[in-house]
């Protein structure tokens, strides 16, 4: 276990002032007779430390910058103390052991005795007061003059703990520099073999026996904190983590090993902004959504397409939240870029199975994005410039240590690239996008926090001055968080999100038109967290969503146009839910979680509704009545119970098995004629004639942490089966743009999907990254006794996004602290397609005969990316820090097929392949920020 120089001063930890009598001699204080076997022979020192810490359950502390390089030589089993002395004394090092299996190596005097009563000033009571001297306690040891002493934290008081054997211990984990809360930090209690993970506010809590406990606090990219907690009564404390500067730009996926092995969660991935710094991306733009595509079970139909498919489900079964605000279009330029500026994102959590009960309304996945909070200490700024985008971020305190703001802006200047094209249509086109994020945080005392978040994004695309697309996302969320005590809390959120789309087409003057639609999502949610019941974590609450869908206006664009005006009006629906869940630790090895969510969806007027003959196709000739409903009159109600059940059994601390079952209801879906999400897609509510979608998912997984070759690895394998009833498919040849009665253009049926996902991740060393492989199959079945209500003759067919095989390899190699190289290798099976297979003549007319639905596939997809990152100097005192990233997207220049289309030419059918990126895309990006690399 090594630390960079800004945290290593603890090597003076047993001061010359207090312990001068021990100077200039090797010390083995309270040494343990740990046996080291011949298996350690010929290991480098770094590999020896990794292996020893993992297998011998010890922690070795030393100063890496000045440490010599050598190989361990051991011919027979020997004591650890003797082995270290033989190899290190000749370099002038002294070694000490303490009672907690910590090994200290230093050229300075060492003692491991803690002065009694030294920590009296660090007692923490129930009032959530901060520990004194934050600058001092941000490391593993507290400094007094030149002395460092292993730290103990006392929680509560003896008086408050009288007649009690247990106590509730809670606290907050924060960044040592910015003082921002750290979400997803792990608090592990080694003596009890369990732990906790901090929530969005950096808060944690658990019940402990009174007495002393060894606690380890860790987080991606931060230095690990090891402390001894002396629990006297109920109490709380704050702990500050510093950045682990030695792991420069290390790419990390998932929160930490405790989430994977110890929690009941399945199908969950956490992505931090550190994960995307070195991932090579098109045009040099950081993109957290593109990084998500490198995870197992996540696919897209092709480059330049919006949305993606999770475990075989369509794109409309995913829901994105950023700070509780739903976003209904997550892309810029029709899918080339994400609509989320990665500079303002703190972390991104993906739930693809065992979705928390507080979320509902989507069958496949929930993407929960957390925006950064502003710096409460000082004002700062950062930004970057790439070939087609520029971005800037501002943050700072509104009131120091109490409230803060952060504002991120991003825009494009891509038209110059289009002007370079030889094709006149492209040369006359234009494309622009931008987005803005503002996040304001206010702490109202120790128990209340208010967060105000706003988001705006826009896109404008003019295609050869003939067709113009405009679409916008705009919304705000207000979240109030209240702590009742150290362990129980309440969250209240109020949000509104609006998605606007408009299209203008003047390709043909007499048929020129303008078309627009809009979706409004207004939501209120109240959620309670109860953690003061032993071995239980309870969450319950309610939420309600008002959907208002402006289905579309269709109007002539000019006086020459012969298009008739048409307004489809507005539809409304209210989706409400009550939910409760409990995570129950039955034993140190077995934990279960269960939840219920009751949904009620009400479809409201004003609306005219067709009534069709029972059990007959929904076509105009089968209409027997039309019902007229007034404004806010109930047209139709649907209800259902969602289930969440999961269990985790730990065979040991590094190996577990998990099982889970989910049921979900979905009351809103997407209407689109294209395979990929195009800007002109429309959202539609379940109504009188269209039932809600209901889905079940079953999953099982094995999770491992292992140590091999001096490095740690995380391994997981998950299998799943999911089915959905009442999925919506579009009839062949249906016109969706201004269809007043969508049930006449759609059919409902069944979806089945199953698959296996394998993930291997290397966490340590100069070379790190991950590899994953996914095998999956997805099929749809639309059957009926009536031919017009069948697709593919009622026979199951592969879904449009079915890709059985997919693998991703992501690697990063750090040559030096300032230089790193990373690369991706991406492969997937081509998606299904329906081919014309023959020409036949009917009544003298040529007719094409097509294959079965999605019987064939386009060519397989393969791509290699590469990037080189160079950091500026790592001086501590500097005005600003800069870095350069050179990246190549599609290094091999492979012409991956986005689609295959056919033309009838000279009496035969010719097939053509359309590629989005048929050559390498090279980019150079400059990033800057005020301050040094660490802050």
What is each model feature region?
Residues 49, 56, 91, 107-166, ...:
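Short, acidic, small-residue-rich periplasmic hinge/interaction motif at the N-terminus
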Residues 192-203, 636, 640:
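Short, acidic Ser/Thr/Gly-rich low-complexity loop/linker segments typical of extracellular
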Residues 720-723, 742-837, 927:
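Gram-negative outer-membrane beta-barrel transporters
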